[in-house]
């Protein structure tokens, strides 16, 4: 198969089954920047610097979410949901903390929230844009159906592979 043919295939068809089964839903955004090839496919779409940029980013990510649904790719849908959620939380962090720094450098001491910095309103609006799309993802019928099917397939896979964790060992993690 040529590189062009591979690039035109849906990601789910490029991913070995064992790799797909190694994906864990996890809480919130965990794992979003580590699971390839989805990270590389979605990261260029993820932006939140201004409200228009956030609106375009959220729309582009929603379009990918729906495309993954058509392809029957739950992992792609969930990774897209995580990027959308990350857009919401990062924009909110920049709304709450000028410059986006939440903790004092080198410590886990939380810095006070800033009240009136220049970008506060725009970052809050960007966060709301992503939140609306994130809620659509969570409530999406195809997402819910594919999530149940993926978790069941993963439970069976984990059982066959000797209980390598996740569903087979009783550590199912809810998606938020």
Which ranges hold each PLM region?
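Inward-facing hydrophobic residues that define packing positions of alpha-helical scaffold repeats
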Residues: 74, 80-81
């Amino acid at each position: 198969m040529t590189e062009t043919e591979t690039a035109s295939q849906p990601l789910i068809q490029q991913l070995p089954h064992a790799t797909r089964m190694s994906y864990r839903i996890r809480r919130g955004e965990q794992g979003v920047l580590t699971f390839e090839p989805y990270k590389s496919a979605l990261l260029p779409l993820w932006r939140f610097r201004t409200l228009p940029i956030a609106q375009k980013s959220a729309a582009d990510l929603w379009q990918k979410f729906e495309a993954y649904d058509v392809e029957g790719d739950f992992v792609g849908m969930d990774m897209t949901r995580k990027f959308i959620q990350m857009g919401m939380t990062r924009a909110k962090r920049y709304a709450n903390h000028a410059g986006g720094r939440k903790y004092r450098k080198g410590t886990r001491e939380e810095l006070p929230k800033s009240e009136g910095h220049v970008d506060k309103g725009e970052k809050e609006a960007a966060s709301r844009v992503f939140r609306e799309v994130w809620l659509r993802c969570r409530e999406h019928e195809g997402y819910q159906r594919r999530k149940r099917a993926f978790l069941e397939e993963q439970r069976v896979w984990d059982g066959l592979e000797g209980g390598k964790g996740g569903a087979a060992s009783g550590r199912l993690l809810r998606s938020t």
